[in-house]
């Protein structure tokens, strides 16, 4: 924008409207469109730049005021075109304000020396008293954060990532606080050292200090009444409302945090929903949900997670400090009143009931129920595979992704059966078969570590795991035909173990390659690292086929997939899928018989199950 000095006539108008300047020569205005008559009772200090003031601004639906500045003190401020700024109780200091903004009834807004806007903040998740394992920056996604948490004990990698982040921040951080275009800030007390991007609305917040709000035209951010937010970054499409208190947190895209939720040293990504409760040193990956006042998420890594009321974790043995932590793998739930003593690792898509005290590690028995009754711990392997809850979950998550295409930083792979989870299922099936072989069939229960597995549960577990394996192989084979890569895989990438980096499913070999490329300097910028995550995700189906092809050969004891084998796998797939749907229908009928499920709801669900045959071919 081109600026000019004020004319003598404009200064006269301003002064007649009770405006005052420390030095009128340091007040510059837009060459076109500046109108002094829309300024009343304004005090100018330092260097001031003012845009044009020609349009009206909508205050609320059906109520407009002309743009201008009234009842405000400004020091070293640039104001864009057609803003309305009024009722500033204290002052605005060292800020750049964009076009078409409404700022009304605020106390103070300023940038102080050394402001970082929440960028570069190093926090410790999982281990509450650790050295720090997540660095905040505006392009952080769930993969990058999980990668840091997992590997920051590698000092060379940690130093390399810190250097990349430092360079990115130095390149992008503004010299002073900025307010984007179309921003609305009303009835707010204090905004300090905060960058607020386009189309954000802040209404009634108490304090925003050292924050970056990554709002955008396609996914605006809303900050509501009573919110206190310090040393944090809030991403596109999120809302923080109703007296949330947050320190040292990163909030990813389309998250909702509300109703007095308190959080410190935690990260939340991609459509997570947090209300009423508390989080401390928690890593909440995509689609985490906690609704209840009495739930505490502490020292844990979660994704696709649902916390029942009264869920609690203990990261403290009252000896060496609150340093213990655990991982609840993708899709895990904790029932009402559940408690987990860290350290612990819970396998994918499991459900925890009661007070689990013996540091369980069930990664090799996924989709299980873990049940504590008095001093006994029961494990029901594979039970969750055939529940209504799992069926609803795996279908609802893709529909509930509220992130516009333009703002999807975190990668979310929705496959519930993947080389990662199926690898665990293969281990689980083998463990159950070995237990059965070791103790025989004529026993009432089996022991697995501290857990008791009833004989009927073990037999059903083997059956359910096998159903899942056949569904997986058939589905991948069908996709290989459809996408044209059926036959011997063209790559060995994908063989071996797989991991879940908070939504990104990838071969361990690719994760190791990424570590080496960051350490060696082959990846020279944050953008290149983020692009590598995207590249791995784009090749997911190819890597998956390499892994699944080998699995099919081993499962069926064949050397290649002949047309006869292909037909057999398809038959097994259809048979397994129908058995799976039949078990889910039984689970739904059992719940309906409890008497409080509306018949229409039950029939609608059963009808959706009946349509599953449409997806067999």
Where are the model-predicted features located?
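Flexible, glycine/proline-enriched loop segments at strand-loop-helix junctions
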Residues: 82
């Amino acid at each position: 924008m081109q600026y000019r000095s004020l004319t003598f006539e404009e200064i006269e108008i301003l002064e007649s409207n009770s405006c005052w300047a420390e030095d009128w020569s340091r007040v510059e205005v837009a060459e076109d469109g500046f109108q002094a008559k829309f300024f009343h009772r304004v005090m100018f200090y330092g260097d001031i730049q003012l845009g044009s003031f020609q349009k009206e601004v909508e205050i609320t639906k059906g109520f407009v005021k002309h743009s201008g500045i009234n009842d405000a003190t400004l020091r070293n401020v640039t104001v864009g075109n057609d803003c309305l700024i009024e009722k500033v109780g204290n002052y605005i200091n060292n800020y750049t304000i964009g076009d078409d903004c409404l700022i009304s009834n605020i106390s103070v807004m300023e940038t102080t020396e050394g402001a970082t806007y929440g960028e570069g903040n190093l926090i410790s998740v999982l281990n509450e008293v650790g050295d720090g394992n997540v660095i905040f920056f505006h392009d952080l996604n769930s993969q990058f954060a999980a990668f840091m948490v997992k590997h920051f004990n590698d000092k060379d990698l940690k130093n390399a990532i810190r250097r990349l982040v430092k360079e990115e921040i130095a390149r992008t951080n503004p010299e002073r606080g900025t307010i984007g275009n179309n921003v609305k800030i009303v009835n707010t007390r204090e905004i300090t050292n905060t960058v607020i991007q386009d189309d954000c609305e802040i209404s009634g917040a108490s304090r925003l200090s050292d924050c970056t709000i990554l709002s955008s035209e396609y996914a605006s951010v809303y900050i509501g009444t009573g919110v206190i937010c310090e040393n944090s970054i809030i991403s596109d499409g999120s809302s923080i409302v109703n007296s949330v208190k947050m320190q040292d947190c990163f909030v990813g895209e389309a998250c909702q945090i509300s109703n007095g939720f308190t959080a410190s040293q935690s990260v939340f990504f991609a459509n997570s929903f947090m209300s009423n409760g508390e989080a401390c040193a928690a890593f909440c990956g995509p689609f985490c949900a906690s609704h209840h006042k009495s739930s505490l998420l502490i020292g844990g890594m979660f994704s696709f997670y649902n916390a029942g009321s009264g869920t609690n974790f203990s990261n403290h043995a009252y000896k060496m400090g609150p340093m213990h932590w655990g991982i609840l793998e993708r899709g895990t739930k904790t029932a009402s009143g559940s408690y987990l003593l860290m350290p612990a690792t819970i396998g994918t898509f499991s459900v925890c009931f009661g007070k689990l005290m013996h540091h369980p590690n069930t990664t090799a028995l996924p989709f299980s129920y873990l049940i504590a009754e008095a001093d006994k711990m029961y494990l029901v392997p594979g039970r969750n595979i055939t529940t209504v809850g799992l069926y609803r979950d795996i279908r609802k998550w893709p529909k509930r992704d509220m992130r516009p295409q333009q703002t999807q930083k975190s990668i979310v792979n929705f496959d519930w059966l993947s080389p990662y989870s199926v690898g665990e299922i293969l281990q689980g099936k083998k463990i159950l078969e070995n237990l059965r072989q070791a103790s025989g069939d004529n026993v009432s229960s089996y022991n697995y570590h501290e857990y008791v597995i009833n004989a009927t549960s073990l037999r059903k577990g083997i059956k359910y795991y096998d159903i899942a394996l056949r569904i997986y192989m058939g589905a991948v084979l069908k996709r290989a035909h459809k996408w044209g890569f059926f036959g011997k895989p063209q790559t060995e990438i994908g063989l071996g173990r797989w991991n879940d980096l908070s939504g990104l499913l990838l071969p361990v070999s690719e994760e190791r390659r990424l570590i080496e490329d960051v350490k060696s300097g082959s990846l020279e910028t944050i953008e290149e690292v983020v692009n590598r995550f995207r590249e791995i995700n784009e090749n997911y189906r190819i890597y998956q086929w390499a892994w699944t092809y080998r699995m099919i050969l081993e499962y069926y004891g064949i050397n290649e997939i002949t047309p006869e084998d292909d037909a057999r796998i398809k038959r097994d797939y259809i048979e397994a899928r129908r058995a799976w749907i039949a078990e889910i229908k039984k689970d739904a009928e059992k719940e309906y018989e409890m008497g409080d499920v509306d018949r229409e709801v039950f029939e609608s669900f059963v009808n959706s199950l009946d349509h599953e045959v449409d997806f067999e071919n």
